[in-house]
Amino acid sequence: MEGAQKPEAATRQADLNVPVPSPPLIPPPPGEYPIDLSTALRLAEAENPTIAAARARILEALALQTGARALLLPSINPGTNYHLHTGNLQRSAGTVLNLTDQSLYFGGGAGAIVAGTVTIPMVNIIGTLTEAWFEPLAAHQRVIGSSFTALATANEILLDVAILHLELLANQTTLDAQRLTERQSHDLAVIVNDFAVAGERRTADANRAQADWKLRRAAVQRAEESVAVTAARLANRLNLDPTIRLRPAGGPLVPINLIALDTPTHDLIASALQNRPDLAAQSAEVARAEVHYHEELARPWIPTVWLGYSAGVFGGGSNVVPPILAHFGGRSDFDASLFWTIMNLGAGNISLQNRRYAILGEAEARRVRVINLVRQEITSARAQALAARDQIEIARSELASAENGLREDRERSRNNLGRPIEVLNSLSLVGGARVNVIAALLRYNQAQFRLFVALGSPPPLLEPPQENLPPPPVTTPLHAPLPVTGHPFKLGFE
């Protein structure tokens, strides 16, 4: 039996003769970039492609608004035309003539043939007065909605960046805590193994201590994985090179208090309904749908206008009135038309009106859905923050008790009053309590940021930007076309 134990002891000793803390499981990156929360938020504001796309849509909406406001501005058509006819023509009285004639027109417009007007006027205004009146109003609401949507998109992305940075900092802190626990577990395993080899402790205690140390080593590896994955996700949000490892900076993980949690929930909801940009964007969509509905109601009663004016030089001739191309002189034409359109005996107009009314109802329903979402986000974030605040105190108390128990068990073990398994159990409790404190702090800080953004503002810049930093490893630089900050509009929700 003793001979069988010697190889086992040698195996345990060989396993314990490894570097502690364990070397990184994930190969080291080619470089690191330190980043604090304020720097991450500023980078996302400038480089995130989703935010840039939302702001580009504001420019698109402004372009559409310009086009809507210009519906009744005239178009200018300089041009010329040449006409040649050879062969039979029939007069209105029925007489058929064999005729060769030609004409030439140049100046403003085109399409001047025989006695008709210039078919393509030099100055031409054509448009439905219904659209000329209502489309600028709808386009203005589109601009408002796009601006608020860009704000809401920025808030969403910046919140995601803040959540990921807090998670990265917590994961790095967890990694440090797991390494500390691994080192303490390894030291305990070495001591228990030495006593077991000397015959002063049971072999089972040595095996159990070694198994616990290996579990701690695996926990360190999982923590390394979490740090690397979170850093890559944050780099994606910041449009940075993911091969450069982001390293959290800005100090230790501490509670961040942004919103006073004793504020009544209904007050928070009332403030959010006044300031949420996504709700303002949806209200603009409702207003735009209402404009389009009234446009279809007015369409059968408002005419379409057609105005044309042309001026140029015209001349021509024929084999009946020679010369065949002469008699050039100035000419001008002015034409005006108004007409009303009843589409498909009115059925087409009714169809358009019903469609626009349905779209208005859909927009109203989406606005109510956003209102409910705002209420739910405020209530949930506040509840999460309140629960996490209590969990922080519980976890800290748990850690203090576990550390006291560990000290007492170590002292008892040194005096041969306790078994090593008791120290091992206490160390396991300390390691778990350390992770619990970090997790509670992370949940509290994330809930505070969610509550702050749910009220309608972007995440705050809590610190000044880092100084003397190298340029960030941006993969494809973006330049947001239209920075949007703040929204002065009030929605009027109670």
Feature locations, PLM:
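Periplasmic alpha-helical coiled-coil/stalk elements that build and connect Gram-negative outer-membrane
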Residues: 150, 154-271, 384, 388, ...
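Regulatory alphaC helix of protein kinase catalytic domains
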Residues: 15-43, 47
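Metallo-beta-lactamase
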Residues: 223, 277, 284, 440
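Small/polar, glycine/serine/threonine/aspartate-rich low-complexity segments that form flexible
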Residues: 24-32, 79-125, 251-262, 293-298, ...
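Acidic, low-complexity, intrinsically disordered peripheral segments
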Residues: 1-6, 86, 242, 367, ...
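A glycine-/polar-enriched beta->alpha junction
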Residues: 42-52, 59-75, 87, 109-140, ...
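Amphipathic alpha-helical coiled-coil segments and their boundaries
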Residues: 40, 47, 54, 125, ...
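Hydrophobic, well-ordered secondary-structure elements that form the walls
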Residues: 338, 356, 363, 385-388, ...
